[in-house]
Amino acid sequence: MRYSIDLSLVRKKILNSIQNTDSGHLGPSFSCTEILFVILKKYINFKDKNRNKIILSKGHAAPAIYAIFDYLKLLKKNELNTLRKFSSRLQGHPDKKKLKLLDFGTGALGQGLSVSIGYAHSSKLLNKKNFIFCILGDGELQEGQVWESAMYIGSNNIKNIITFIDGNKFQNEFSIKETLKEVNLRGKWESFGFKYIETDGHSTEKLEKIIKNIMSYKYKKPVVVYCNTIKGKGVSFMEGNNKYHSVKKLPLEQYNEALKELDGQK
C-alpha cells in the first residue's frame, strides 16, 4: 500500500500524543487515519486562500488530524505533546479559535454537514471553485441534523461537498448493530439524491481514485463515500475492540507492543 511508512508514523504520533496526555480517543482516530491523510496530504493546500476545506464532524478523532498536521510540519516543534493540555492549541475536540489551521470547531456530533453547506454557499457567492470534505462517524448518523443536511444538499444538488462516513461499526459504548437495527444507508442517501459509493477506507489508492472522480464532477450529483474501516486499525489487540474507543495511558507492555506492531508495518 502507498504511504505505509507515513501512515505508520502518523499512527505512532497519535498513540504517543494520547499516551503522553493520559487521555484521548484512540480507536476512532486510527479508523479514519487514511481518510484524513489522503485529504490533507493531497487535496488541502494551506497556502492557497481559496483552498478546499475539511470539516471533521466526528471531532473526537482530533488526535488523528493533529498528528497529520504534525506530519505535514504545520505544528510547532513538540506541540503534539500538548494535546488536551491547559491553554494548548490542540484541544480534545477541534477548536478553531485556538488552532487556525482548522476550518471549524466540532465535538457536538451531527453538525459538520450543516457547516459544510454554509461553506459551499459561501464559495458560490465568492465564486470559489473549491470543495468541502466532511468526515462523519457511522454512529453520528443517528443525529437528525445529519439527515436534514443530507436532504438539503440533495435537493439543491450541492456537488462540491464530499461526504465521507467512517464506517468502523462502533460508537461510544456499543456496536452500531447493538444500538440500532440494520439500516439501509445506501437507500436512504440515494433517496435524497446522492451518489453512494462504498469502499475500503484503509486503501489510499481507492480513496484517491474516488476523490479524483468526484472532483471531476463525474457523477453530476452530490456524493457520499461509505468507508469500511476498522476501529483501532493498525494494532491487532485494538482492532474491532471498543475498549479502546477512549483511553487513558496504556500499560507499558501494551504501549510497547502497539509501537512494535506499528513499526512492523513499514
Where are these regions (language model features)?
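N-terminal capping segment at the start of a domain
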Residues: 7-23, 166-168
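Cofactor-binding active-site loop characterized by glycine-rich and histidine/acidic residues
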Residues: 14-17, 29-155, 181
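Glycine-rich beta-alpha junction loops
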Residues: 34, 60-61, 168-169, 228-232
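Generic beta-sheet signal
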Residues: 52-54, 130-134, 161, 219-229
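Short acidic, glycine/serine/threonine-rich loops at helix termini
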Residues: 66-68, 95, 145-147, 173-177, ...
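Conserved thiamine diphosphate
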Residues: 128, 177-210
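A short alpha/beta connector and helix-capping loop motif
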Residues: 143-168, 222-226
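Glycine/aspartate-rich loop-and-adjacent alpha/beta segment that forms the canonical ThDP
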Residues: 204-266
